[in-house]
Amino acid sequence: DMPVMDIELARVRPDLDINEYDPAFEKAAELGATDVLGSIWTRDKAYYIDQVAKIAEMAKKYGLKYNVEFLPWAGVRNLQEAITLVDTVKADNLYIMVDTLHAGRAGVTGAELARTDPKYFNFIHLCDGPAGPDGDPVLDNIKDELMLFTAREGRLYPGEGAMDIAGMVKGMPEIPLSIELPNLKRIEELGVAGHAKRCLDTAKAYFKEHGID
């Protein structure tokens, strides 16, 4: 049997009732999951802090950790905003999940992650993505079609794009790595199983090339 690590997505959004997450959390715990992933879709800071605190409390009831990811076009857009959220809520099961694509787009560097207290981090989403027209992985326009398309259906295998995956991984503690790599073109070419195998194979090769054990 393959164990389950995390479930998603426990979002904070004004039109969603977070109480509806409770049955999913209960089932996740039954399946042996340890983590829940969430994201914030409002810029109302007081509101999302309150909601995150309640979700973290709900997750704790089932022995789950709640991990919030930052995305440049979401309510919590970068690492510093995510740190502020965790520091404000003060829940002992609340963490930041770093997605290497979103972090790269937000301008997060390996050096910045290395300077950050490792207590904030719990797991990583691993993937690559193309640079913008100027060759920079950071895209300033949050409505940029490349940003949205890549995130939803065009992520690249590690080493194919412009993200400093090695720098980010080396800048964080030794925590679980979860490959999140939706790519409809690759799935069409290779099939679901073939794409999954390519994800794992390229990640292993990338880590070996960059001296990551």
Briefly describe each language-model feature range.
Residues 3-96, 105, 191, 210-213:
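Active-site acidic/histidine proton-transfer and metal-coordination neighborhood
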Residues 27-32, 57, 79-98, 104-213:
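Histidine-acidic metal/acid-base catalytic patches
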